[in-house]
Amino acid sequence: MSHSDILFLSQSSGSQFQKVTTFIDIANNMIYEYFGTKTDFDIIICHGSWEMEVQIVSRIHNLHSGQYYTTKSAAITDYRLKEIIVRCDIAKFGHYLHELIHGILGKKHPHQLKEGLAWYFTEVLTAPKVYLMPSLSVFILESYVTPVRKLASILGEGFLKDFALGNAYVHEEAFSKDIRDLFLPEEVFYTKKRYFR
């Protein structure tokens, strides 16, 4: 099993510490039960927009080219450094689950595909308790989640899970345009999204 460290950037109250570590433990257990693995990414917990801004600015060159992060982001994942950064004052359980899923996804998937897979599986794992799923913007739903839902209906849940982990492969040419777009180079995908908005 994988192991990750949790680092709090600033002093937390006992209740805040307990909430964060409980969310991480429960999310990791859900992921392990469903996928049979869990992330080894370290988790950095920050509080407030200033701490999040420092994290974003310090790693902006590691983040994906088309992605736009703000201090309002609840969480981000830095694949190069294998770190998940969570802004605990605004993150809900679903944000922790979503980012921890990012940590187990196949390394060769482009960012937008990882984003879609992570939100899709967050939705699947929170289905019994839908209140745990954060509300998603129309952009996230249309760009990431809807195409992955279509992919799941074609491939089936088991195969999609293997594919998400990087243990199975697909020929994206066989799918509709919205699904194929998830396989584009990141720069092309995000340029198209900005241009056609």
Regions found by a protein language model. Give the residues of each.
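A generic hydrophobic-helix recognition signal that picks specific residues
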Residues: 91-95, 108, 195-197
